[in-house]
Structures are given as structure tokens and as C-alpha cells.
Amino acid sequence: MKAKSLMVVGTTSHAGKSLLAAVICRWLAQQGYRVTPFKGQNMALNAYVTREGGEIGYAQAMQAWAAGIEPEVAMNPILLKPQGNMTSQVILRGQVVGVTRAADYYRDYFERGWQAITEALADLQQRFDWIVCEGAGSPAEINLKHRDLTNMRVATYLGAPTILVADIDRGGVFAHIVGTLMLLEPAERALIQGIVINKFRGQRSLLDSGLQWLEETTGVPVLGVIPWLERHYAAEDSLDLWDPRPQRQGADLKITVIRLPRIANFTDIDPLLAEPSVAVEFLPPHRPLGRPDAVILPGTKTTIADLQVLRETGMAEQLKTYAAQGGTILGICGGWQMLGTAISDPLGLEGCPGTYEGLGLMPLHTQLGPTKCTQQQQTQSLYFNCPEPILGYEIHQGQSEYTGDRQGWHPLFAAPELGLVNRAGTLWGTYLHGLLENGPWRRHWLNGLRSRRQLPPLPTAIPHYGEQRTVALDELTKTVMAHLNLRGICKLC
């Protein structure tokens, strides 16, 4: 018997599709169903690597964990990773197949993409009871509908009852909903079986007259109003980083993350956001660095271009001065490559071929090449006493070699190519995404920062962040489902 299907689309980007899809996955799984998420095509710089070494959007990995299953490539057969100048890296069935310009994508990849989507759906339909699908952006972009692989084309193919979610916090929610429905084809509009309003602040009763009008005007029931929630889940794209973030008051430590223009895999920071004693700031490169307890240079899709931005804005010099004064810097993936002496791009993969000077803070030379490394890793910590294996994953388009005198530098892990630290414990670099999810390792690293402030150490015998994420998903599902009624729409599936 084929799986039942449910679709979630949004009036805009950032409306809450990923959150709602994750909650529905969790809710159905709690009832004993075998559930899988699905997003035909995703455009995001937050990615995850499956056990088989395939790359998918991190949001689909999060939804898989919500469903209680291991992420796999079939959940997101197409991933587009923007890399500037109107180009994107195309990842099909988990593997890089090329780079395309927006104007050429439809011609070069539409048919191949739709085939990958239908094959993935056929596979999932045979193995699961439910497929919870997520759209992308808006389903009513009339100039793009002929090339839309993600929204109503998938819903129509599956005959899936569809939920339309809208963000009320940005204003204009009724116009967004009615306008979206008006722009859909009649057959597509007939699939919309429910409306969800997300991010509501204030007194619920003040919405009642508007909701009544909405149902009478559209003929579509409102399934619920989700209140504004502090972020319990990983954001899908860097748009989230532009939202004002309240600084945690009374925190012992301040950690500054450089908000690179093409920042990628900033989900690496989520475990720090969950630490009560840590305040995290995402800082644009043109702003003064100040004197935080630590700086993180995160991953980036275009290392060389973002390195140039650091130079042009003066952030490169600020980081060098900060390091010379004993400040702590952790570079992750592309951020680690920047900390080295040089980055070579002989094939011009990121623009003009050449060799570019790094920040010169670590004995590391990186050469970009055509082969992309995407694999999960399990290793042992050498620098900190962590009895449990260190888990993470690599996503990088380049190989790094240690150069010059390595006196005073120590490998972080049993696999020495995965990370390096100086003797003073102030300059850190790693290729491991997800490193800070390893609870004992994260606490040891934070305790090093705390000792410089003469603060007592935190307990290190704590579980992996994945356990904390599971609790958060349960709490999120309980909170959201208290404001939704999905039983009616599920009966239509």
C-alpha cells in the first residue's frame, strides 16, 4: 500500500514551512506511523551529509530526526547551493553534478530534476506510511511556475491535501493568503485544504473576525494560529540571521560569530545558542569586533570571496590583532581555510584562478579542486579527555596540508587532518561540522574560556546535543499542536 501524502506550502519564504513539516512528522511518528519528510528541491547553504555520503538540506535532516529516522538522500533529491553571481552548485541525488546560472537551470536540469523527484517519491511511497512534503518560497510565483519543481507540481502529482502557512509577524497576512490562493490554478487551489497562521503575537481573540472573514471568503478552513515561538529548530537559510536576536542577559561568556556574506552551515552554532551561560552574537564584517571571549569563523560557500570581504572591511586586521592579544578563534571548514597561510584555486572554481593570501594564523595551505568531500566522521579527541567518539561530517571543496614548522601545534583528533590547535589553546581549526554538538567536547572548550575569566568549570559529562534536540522537538510539537487541528485534513489523505 502506497504512503499517504500531506503537503505544506507557504505564502512567502520564512513563513514557517520547515517548522510545521517537522512538527507534523513528529506528531504522526508519535502515533506509531512510519513517516518521512520530503522536499523535491531545496535552495540552502545549510546542508547535512547522510551516512552514504550524500548531501541534503539540513531542514530535511531535522525533519527526519523529528520523524525518528535517519536522514537519506531521497528526502531531498535536489539541493541548490548559491555561490554568488547568480550561480548555484547543483546537487542531484546527493552528489554534485555541476554549476548553473539561474537563467540556464530550467534548460539544463528541469527534466533530470523532475525524474529524480518522482523516483525518490516512488521509493519513499513503498517504505513509509506517510510522506510529509514541504514546498519552497511561494507556490504562486507566476513568472516561475513553469519551472517550479517543489510546490504544487509535487502536490498535484501526489494528489496531496495541502496546508498553506502564512507569517503574520511581517504584516499583510490576509492579503498574502488571499493573493496566493487567487494566483493558483483552480485544480491547485482545490488541493489547499487548510490555512495556518504562524508567528502571532498578542491576544488571539483579536483575530477572530479576520479569521471568520478569511474562511468565508476563501472557503478554506483555518486549522490554527501558532503563537510566536523562540527558535527551537535550525533555520534553513541565512535570512534568519538578519532577524534581531535578543542578547542573553547575564551570560558568563560572549562568543561572536562572523556573519560572512555567504555563510554556510551556521547550524554548527545551535549548540552554543542552547548553552544558558553563553551569549552568541552574529556580527557583520564591517562592524567593530570588540573583545569577545571567542570568535568563530564559520563555514562559507565561497571561501575566497568571503576572505576578500574580511580584508575590504578591515575585519581581517581586527582578527589578527585579536589573535595577537591572546584572543580565541575557532575556524570551521571554510573558516579554518581562511585562518591558514594561503588558498589556491588553480581551476578558478570560485572565480579567477590564482593563490590568495590567508589570515596567516595557522600553518595550513588549502588547494581547491573539483572533488568535493562529503562524508560522516567518527573519531577520537586527542586534545580533550572525551571518552565518547567525536561525531561530525565534512563538506568541503578543497584539501588542506600542514605547512612549515608545526612545533607548538597539536592535532585535535585521532584523524589529524580534521583539526589543529596551538599550544596556547587559542587558535582552533577543524573540518568537522557538528563538532560542537558533542557535549563533552563543547563543555571542555567552553571551560577553557571560562578559566580565563576565573569562572568555575561546567560539568562535562553531558549527552550529545542530539538528545537535547529530541527534547526540544517534543516540546515544540506539544506547543504547536495545542494550537492546531490537523485531524480533519489528515482524514482527507
Swiss-Prot record:
Pathway(s) of this molecule:
Cofactor biosynthesis; adenosylcobalamin biosynthesis
Specify the domain of life of the species encoding this protein.
Answer: Bacteria
PROSITE patterns with a match to the protein in the record: GATASE_COBBQ
Q: Give any Pfam family that matches.
A: GATase_3
Q: Name one GO molecular function term.
A: catalytic activity
Tell me the Gene Ontology biological-process terms attached to this UniProt entry: cobalamin biosynthetic process
Function recorded in the entry: Catalyzes amidations at positions B, D, E, and G on adenosylcobyrinic A,C-diamide. NH(2) groups are provided by glutamine, and one molecule of ATP is hydrogenolyzed for each amidation.
Query: Which residues act catalytically here?
Result: C333 (nucleophile), H433
Q: Does the keyword Oxidoreductase apply?
A: no
The record's annotation in SUPFAM superfamilies points to: Class I glutamine amidotransferase-like (SSF52317), P-loop containing nucleoside triphosphate hydrolases (SSF52540)
Keywords annotated in UniProt: Cobalamin biosynthesis, Glutamine amidotransferase
PANTHER family with a match to the protein in the record: COBYRIC ACID SYNTHASE, DETHIOBIOTIN SYNTHETASE
| Family to which the UniProt record says this protein belongs | Belongs to the CobB/CobQ family. CobQ subfamily.
Q: List the disulfide bonds.
A: none
Q: Which InterPro entries match?
A: Class_I_gatase-like (IPR029062), CobQ/CobB/MinD/ParA_Nub-bd_dom (IPR002586), CobQ_GATase1 (IPR033949), CobQ_N (IPR047045), CobQ_synth (IPR004459), GATase_3 (IPR011698), P-loop_NTPase (IPR027417)
Q: What is this protein called?
A: Cobyric acid synthase
Q: Start and end of every GATase cobBQ-type domain?
A: 252-441
Gene field: cobQ
